[in-house]
Amino acid sequence: MRILWIVAVCLIGVEGNLFQFAKMINGKLGAFSVWNYISYGCYCGWGGQGTPKDATDRCCFVHDCCYGRVRGCNPKLAIYAYSFKKGNIVCGKNNGCLRDICECDRVAANCFHQNQNTYNKNYKFLSSSRCRQTSEQC
């Protein structure tokens, strides 16, 4: 019960893009799927280093690179327009950086969906000591 309360408090404080990204992931993969990607491999979650462990981890690497190219707003906080149409994520009428962030998130959510078969439970909560190789360039 205490853990549920902590999770609820954390989610109440989540605004903007990261919450929208989570909703995209859940929309493509099913309710609560986002929890599978919060700390996975070397790149899913905060930060990232080393070589992606599999195609799922590479989705996060590419997403990190995409966020790194966004200029003009904070990708983790900005709120953009999007919707689901027939199971597809459609970015709305966003301008500039909001459009770019939405596209980063849309591509990553689709990538997770397309690479579900590579998901390896052994990479969930992977120790950072297993991600010490030289990081790839974006």
UniProtKB/Swiss-Prot annotation:
Task: Enumerate the subcellular locations listed in this protein's record, separating them with semicolons.
Answer: Secreted
PROSITE patterns per the UniProt record, alphabetical: PA2_ASP (PS00119), PA2_HIS (PS00118)
UniProt-annotated catalytic positions: 63, 105
Which InterPro entries does the UniProt record give? PLipase_A2, PLipase_A2_Asp_AS, PLipase_A2_dom, PLipase_A2_dom_sf, PLipase_A2_His_AS
Cofactor(s) named in the record? Ca(2+)
Could you give one GO CC term from the UniProt record? extracellular region
So which residues are the signal peptide here? 1-16
| Tissues/organs with expression | Expressed by the venom gland.
Q: Which UniProt keywords apply?
A: Blood coagulation cascade inhibiting toxin, Disulfide bond, Hemostasis impairing toxin, Hydrolase, Metal-binding, Neurotoxin, Platelet aggregation inhibiting toxin, Presynaptic neurotoxin, Secreted, Signal, Toxin
Task: Please state the protein's primary subcellular location.
Answer: secreted
Example GO molecular function term? toxin activity
UniProt-listed GO biological process terms? arachidonate secretion; lipid catabolic process; negative regulation of T cell proliferation; phospholipid metabolic process
- Report the EC number(s), separated by commas if there are several: 3.1.1.4
Q: Does the keyword Signal apply?
A: yes
Report activity regulation. Answer: Enzymatic activity and neurotoxicity are inhibited by Triton X-100, which has been determined to be located in the center of the hydrophobic channel of the enzyme.
Bound cofactor: record note: Binds 1 Ca(2+) ion.
Q: Which cysteines are joined by disulfide bonds?
A: 42-131, 44-60, 59-111, 65-138, 66-104, 73-97, 91-102
Binding residues for Ca(2+): 43, 45, 47, 64
- Please write the reaction equations for the catalytic activity of this protein: a 1,2-diacyl-sn-glycero-3-phosphocholine + H2O = a 1-acyl-sn-glycero-3-phosphocholine + a fatty acid + H(+)
Family according to the record = Belongs to the phospholipase A2 family. Group II subfamily. D49 sub-subfamily.
Biological role: Heterodimer: shows the same activities as the monomer, but with a lower potency. Monomer: snake venom phospholipase A2 (PLA2) that shows presynaptic neurotoxicity, anticoagulant activity and that weakly inhibits ADP-induced platelet aggregation. Inhibits exocytosis in pancreatic beta cells, confirming it can act presynaptically in inhibiting the exocytosis of neurotransmitters in neurons. PLA2 catalyzes the calcium-dependent hydrolysis of the 2-acyl groups in 3-sn-phosphoglycerides.
Q: How does it assemble?
A: Heterodimer; non-covalently linked. The toxic basic protein has phospholipase A2 activity (chain HDP-1P) and the non-toxic acidic protein functions as its inhibitor (chain HPD-1I (AC A4VBF0)).
| The protein's name in its UniProt record | Basic phospholipase A2 chain HDP-1P
